[in-house]
């Protein structure tokens, strides 16, 4: 798989996460934003939302778990691949990451790192899931993220 997504994030690690059309319009007009995380929409609007991002020359990543009318099953990823121009997905579901990778889509596996069990879960799952990136929430955890980066080879 091409490294376009990884290179875009490396070049500019600020990623726009949009929750509504107003935020989408604003980030599409900013030249320093290369990647857009789409955190809203439904099955009727997602193709148009993605099209706006692509017309602005940006990488479109859809948070599958937040799109109205989509299940959190592999068929949802196939729907997005076949009906939108999305470059990839964001999800909390390892099975959806696997499916997206099969379809040559970029992947971000989102974890909520709330305790040591969740931490161990990240370490064990990343060997079988192989996302392009891991997103760790809550975001204000620099010490834990630094420790995690020392233990795994996937960009965090």
Put a short name on every predicted segment.
Residues 59, 106, 131:
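Hydrophobic "anchor" residues on beta-strands that sit immediately upstream
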Residues 1-64, 68-70, 85-87:
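Conserved N-terminal beta1-alpha1 strand-loop-helix module at the mouth
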Residues 40-56, 69-74, 91-105, 114-124, ...:
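Active-site-adjacent beta->alpha loops and helix N-cap segments on the catalytic face
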Residues 17-29, 72-79, 117-125:
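Short, acidic/polar
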Residues 63, 90-92, 108-110:
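Short, conserved beta-strand edge motifs with alternating hydrophobic and charged residues
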Residues 36-37, 109, 133-136:
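Short catalytic-loop micro-motif centered on adjacent basic/acidic residues
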Residues 29, 78-90, 124-135:
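Structural recognition of alpha->loop->beta junctions
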Residues 14, 33-34, 104-107, 154:
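Active-site regions of enzymes building and remodeling cell-envelope glycoconjugates
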